Amino acid sequence: MVSPILQLTNISKSFGHVQANKNINLTINKGTIHGIIGENGAGKSTLMSIVYGLYQADSGTIKVNEKEIKLKSPRDSIENGIGMVHQHFMLVENFTVLENIVLGFEGELVFGKNLIRAYF
């Protein structure tokens, strides 16, 4: 039997009086591909933002490789092997390509220095 790589259990998130996610359960096994579909406002982006650490769930648990984790930031997600490609690229319009890349980089400073050296 394949072990779950990601488990969401009873994930809920509200913004004021608006319930964006209510008791969401999702299990993803290693080597599988899933899509999340729904109408506008159904809570898809909110759920993915919780998994990526941009939002914190009001309740529920998240497990990666059967270990319960707390995702307080995107860095926590990345450290647990979770990445996210945004539907709409979040670029700063008046920045250069290099500046946008460096802005989004969350790794060691060495990478940024090497990137700048390669660019110039």
Where are these regions (language model features)?
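Glycine-rich phosphate-binding loops of nucleotide-dependent enzymes
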Residues: 1-120
